[in-house]
Structure formats: structure tokens, C-alpha cells
């Protein structure tokens, strides 16, 4: 095997063309081995094997600096830069993350997981090189889907005025996670159809030289193109046309499904991980929205390139027709456009991952909330139980958006809560609303009669004394368990409160607790600093009531075990009960 002998990029440069092709096949087999057992990004990596080999064959990493956009397509890069064992041996799977990571290798320059950043990051490397009077190539590798992000276009706009070496490799597989959306993709198609000869050329218009590679999975053609641009003195775009999922028939045929995949059986492609429950919030949301759309033509569902976050498969997107809007990887545009839709009488729903919400704070604050337009934002994977890569954490959204004036941020506990909140939000016209969608699907079958327009009214679900537990959203079940532990340890029945509202205090409820409670505990599924619990602690600051806030400390976690993080932050029912007993005794 050739791959077993590759310990660094210089080993790649010792191989001839036939050996490089054999290496590519071995790398795909290694990818198949790891991904079938571990899961991960499939299609992007299978399509980038030859291009990665050619990059390391022509350029001298890490002296020549390669920056991968999103970096979900960096598995082949890791194989060739000393980390092959993570793809050849199951016991080494956890040696690497799914993204570039400078702690792993000198060949990785940034922790990257969000999209459209590579051109800007790489242009910074190039600028620093020039300021210091150094040389060397700087290469940004970006997929065509990532070009729909504004930061990518900002970076290309800047690159067009550079007067030194800067290479942008456009990996064009005619796909984002799902299909691409946006006018610029007509130009990419025109360039593909004309072998890069079309007079209308986005990259030339931005001031970059341009090289086209018709077959981006042809190692010889790639090597020739990269040699052509190596040590260039002006910015240049190398447009390579690749096949997403190349080498595995199912991934070639079903590109969206195989963008990322759970562990699977290689022969059949069927997932080997046991399926979850019958219901989940993706499915429930999709069912609700489609019904709502049929009843009301002004309802629309917006996604920024992740339509399945709220269950909109290709079939459902087609059923929704013009009421489904995919803006591409453009969260800023999604938020601002939603505000415009609401302003003109539409009823916009925008579903977005908590981590990606970070990309559009200004539009939420300025364009939505200052204007007080009735946009509904569903925030997904906002939990310690969500994605656990450092670049995709969903634990910062409460401090980030709950302090924006005019916004109503809601925390449902059950599916019934969630659907009632959705219905209220889409029908009202007074408030921008965000809903923190739980991870765990809970249905109690109880009808929800609460009027969410009567803002900041908590629900006392269990009346007790001495100790009150205010348990927010997805941590409400933890509050129930902690209350039971406290009762077992002390004989005291704690008061249990479901607050529903992240953005406001029910001062009447909190004032009432002063009469017969000495301790108030708050529970939230996110970081404590600037969060929900601190607001309640501040309310009781000048009173005799003692408060303790339970949540996560402020840190960047990476590939963590949830149970360990919960224990470290005293977020088990037993630990919460012990702390409560200690507070009563003091």
C-alpha cells in the first residue's frame, strides 16, 4: 500500500502518476473504512481526493499555506500530513477532528467549521507574508456552495486588488449541502459549459486571473494547473469541476443524503445506528409548516442552505413551492429578508442552527428587532446535547440574543409547547420571536391553553416551599429529577417552575417566592455568563433569598462526552440536590 508509507507531503512527491492514482484509490478505501464505522462528511471528501493529492504534490506545505473552507473536506489532507492512522485504524479514529485543527498538525492553520471564511483567512496569511517580506504560496480551497456566503465574496473582492501571490481553488461540484441557490451559479454553469472560456466570468470581473480544469478528479490535469499558478505574482482562481461523492455509487447518485452520513453498511448504504423515536422536531416542524402553507399563502419557510434542519427534504421543498426559500449560505441575508417579508405582511419562519445564528447578530438586532418586525426564528441544536465540535457548539445563543430589546425568546419543554408557540408567533404581528427548539422530543399529549402574547408569565407546575427550581426549556426534566432528589433527601417539596420565556422575568412570580422560599435554583442548557439565571440572581440580589445558577461555564468545548460535561458543571440531579441541601444548611 502507498498510503501506509505516506508520513508527510514530501512522500507524495516521490510517486509517479500511476502510483498517485493508486494512492487515490487507497485513500477512498480508507475514507470508506472510517466513515462506514464512524460517520462524518462523506461527499465532500470523496470528491476532493485527487485535488488534495495534486495540491500536496505541487506545493510545499506548510511553507506553502493551504486553507480549507469549512474544512469538512480536509480528511484527504489529513491522510497526507501525518494522520493516516486515523483513517486506517479504528482505535485511532478519535485522534483527529472532522475539521482542520492547528493542535493536530502544522499543516492546519485554523480551526474552521463555518463556511465562506477561507478566502478572508488566507488573504490575511498572504498579507502578513508580504508585510514581513517573505515568500511562499498561499492557497484558499473553497467549494462552490460556500461562494453564496457574503464573506467569501468580500474576500474575493479584496483579493482582486492584491498584487502578490494568492491562489483560490474553486471546488465546483454543483452542490451545497443540498442544491445550490443564487444567481452566481448561472455563471459557474456557463463557465463549466464553455470549458472556462465564457466572456462573462465572475472571477475575472473581480480582478483575479483564471484557470479552468474540466476534470477536477484527473490528477495529471490538476498537477498541470497547479504548476501553472505556483509562485504567481498576482491573485488567481483555479476553477476545478469535481464529482461529489466520487467513488461510491450511492453517494454519486444521492448527493444531498450523502453530504454527511451516519455509520452505514458499505454494501447497502443503510445506516447501522439504531433509529431514534418515531417523532422528532424536524418532522413535526415540516408537517406543521406544510399544513400552515396550504391554509395561508403568506406563510413561508426560509433556510440558509440547511433545509433538513426543519425537515424539508427535496420532496417537501417541491411541495412547498414558492413558499420555500433557500437563500444559500447567507444567514445575514436570510434574517434581513425575513424582516422585509414581515414588514410587507408575510409570515416568515426561519430555521437555523444555534451555531450559525452567530453569523447574523447584527441583522437580528438591527434589521429585525429595532424595526420590531414579526419574524419567527426556530433555533435548532441549541443544547449541550447538540453538535459537539468546537466550531458547531449550540450553547451560546441565550446570552447572544436574549438581551436584544424587543425580541421574545421562548423555551418550550414539550412538542405541544413548541407547536403552540409556533402558531402564536406566526399569527401575531407585534414581536420578533425566537424559539429554542429542544433536542429531546417530549410529548405529554396535553393541550396548551397558555396565551404566549401575555409576555413573561411563568408557570408554577409544582407548589412547595423553602426551595424553588426555575428550570428552563430542555433542562426542565432535569429540574423535575432534581426536585425529586431534594424531596428524598430533605422531606421538603420544592417549588418547580417552567419559565417559558428566556427574555423576560415574571416579577410577580419571583416576588411571591420571597414569602416562603430561602433558596432559588435556576437551570439552563447553555453558558451561564450573560444567560437566563443571572437575570433571576440579579432580581434577588438585594433580598434574603439565596440563588444558585446551574449551567455551563464559558469555554470552547470540543468533541466532549455530555455526561462528563454535565458532571463537571454540577448538572446532575444528584449534584443539584446536594448543593441545595448545603445551601439550606448554611
Q: Which role does the model predict for each range below?
A:
Residues 73, 108-265, 270-278, 282-287, ...:
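Glycine-rich ThDP/TPP pyrophosphate-binding loop and its adjacent helix/strand module
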Residues 19, 24, 28-31, 40-47, ...:
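Cofactor-pocket helix-loop regions in the catalytic cores of large enzyme subunits
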Residues 41-162, 299, 304, 313-314:
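Cofactor-binding active-site loop characterized by glycine-rich and histidine/acidic residues
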Residues 86-96, 161-175, 369-381:
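A glycine-rich helix N-cap at a beta->alpha junction
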Amino acid at each position: 500500500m502507498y498510503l501506509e508509507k505516506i508520513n508527510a507531503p514530501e512522500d507524495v512527491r516521490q510517486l509517479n502518476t500511476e502510483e498517485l492514482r493508486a494512492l487515490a484509490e487507497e485513500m477512498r478505501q480508507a475514507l470508506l473504512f472510517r466513515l462506514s464505522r464512524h460517520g462524518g462528511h462523506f461527499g465532500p471528501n470523496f470528491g476532493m481526493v485527487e485535488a488534495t493529492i495534486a495540491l500536496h504534490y505541487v506545493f510545499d506545505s506548510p511553507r506553502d499555506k493551504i486553507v480549507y473552507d469549512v474544512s469538512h473536506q480536509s480528511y484527504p489532507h489529513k491522510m497526507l500530513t501525518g494522520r493516516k492512522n486515523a483513517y486506517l485504524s479504528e482505535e485511532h479514529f478519535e485522534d483527529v477532528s472532522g475539521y482542520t485543527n492547528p493542535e493536530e498538525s502544522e499543516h492546519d492553520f485554523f480551526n474552521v467549521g463555518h463556511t465562506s471564511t477561507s478566502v478572508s483567512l488566507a488573504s490575511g496569511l498572504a498579507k502578513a507574508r508580504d508585510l514581513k517580506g517573505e515568500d511562499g504560496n498561499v492557497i484558499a480551497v473553497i467549494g462552490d456552495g460556500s461562494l453564496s456566503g457574503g464573506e467569501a465574496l468580500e474576500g474575493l473582492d479584496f483579493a482582486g486588488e492584491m498584487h502578490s501571490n494568492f491562489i483560490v481553488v474553486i471546488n465546483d461540484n454543483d452542490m451545497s449541502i443540498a442544491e445550490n441557490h443564487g444567481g452566481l451559479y448561472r455563471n459557474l454553469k456557463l463557465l463549466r459549459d464553455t470549458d472556462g472560456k465564457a466572456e462573462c466570468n465572475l472571477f475575472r470581473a473581480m480582478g483575479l486571473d483564471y484557470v479552468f480544469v474540466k476534470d477536477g478528479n484527473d490528477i495529471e490535469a490538476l498537477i498541470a494547473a497547479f504548476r501553472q499558478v505556483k509562485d504567481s505574482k498576482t491573485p488567481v482562481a483555479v476553477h476545478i469541476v469535481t464529482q461529489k461523492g466520487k467513488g461510491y455509487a450511492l453517494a454519486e447518485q444521492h448527493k444531498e443524503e450523502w453530504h454527511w452520513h451516519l455509520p452505514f453498511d458499505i454494501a447497502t448504504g443503510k445506516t447501522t445506528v439504531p433509529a431514534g423515536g418515531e417523532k422528532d422536531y424536524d418532522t413535526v416542524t415540516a408537517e406543521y409548516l406544510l399544513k400552515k402553507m396550504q391554509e395561508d399563502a403568506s406563510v413561508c419557510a426560509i433556510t440558509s442552505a440547511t433545509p433538513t434542519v426543519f425537515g424539508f427534504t427535496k420532496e417537501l421543498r417541491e411541495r412547498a413551492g414558492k413558499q420555500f426559500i433557500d437563500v444559500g449560505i447567507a444567514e445575514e441575508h436570510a434574517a434581513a429578508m425575513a424582516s422585509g417579508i414581515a414588514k410587507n405582511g408575510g409570515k416568515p419562519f426561519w430555521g437555523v442552527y444555534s451555531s450559525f445564528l452567530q453569523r447574523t447578530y447584527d441583522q437580528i438586532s438591527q434589521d429585525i428587532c429595532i424595526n420590531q418586525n414579526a419574524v419567527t426564528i426556530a433555533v435548532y441544536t441549541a443544547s449541550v446535547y447538540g453538535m459537539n465540535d468546537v466550531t458547531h457548539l449550540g450553547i451560546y445563543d441565550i446570552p447572544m440574543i436574549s438581551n436584544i430589546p424587543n425580541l421574545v425568546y421562548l423555551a418550550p419543554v414539550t412538542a405541544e409547547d413548541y407547536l403552540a408557540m409556533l402558531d402564536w408567533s406566526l399569527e401575531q404581528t407585534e414581536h420578533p420571536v425566537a424559539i429554542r427548539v429542544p433536542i429531546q422530543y417530549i410529548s405529554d399529549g396535553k393541550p396548551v391553553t397558555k396565551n404566549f402574547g401575555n409576555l413573561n408569565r411563568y408557570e408554577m407546575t409544582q407548589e412547595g416551599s423553602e426551595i424553588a427550581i426555575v428550570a428552563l426549556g430542555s433542562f426542565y426534566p432535569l429540574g423535575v429529577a432534581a426536585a425529586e432528589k431534594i424531596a428524598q433527601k430533605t422531606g421538603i417539596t420544592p417549588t418547580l417552575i417552567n419559565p417559558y420565556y428566556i427574555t423576560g422575568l415574571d416579577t410577580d412570580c419571583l416576588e411571591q417566592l420571597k414569602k416562603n422560599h430561602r433558596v432559588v435554583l435556576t437551570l439552563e442548557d447553555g453558558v451561564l455568563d450573560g444567560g437566563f439565571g443571572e437575570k433571576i440572581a440579579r432580581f434577588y440580589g438585594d433580598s434574603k433569598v439565596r440563588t444558585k445558577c446551574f449551567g455551563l461555564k464559558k469555554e470552547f468545548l470540543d468533541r466532549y462526552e455530555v455526561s462528563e460535561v454535565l458532571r463537571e458543571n454540577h448538572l446532575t440531579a444528584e449534584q443539584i440536590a446536594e448543593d441545595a441541601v448545603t445551601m439550606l444548611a448554611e
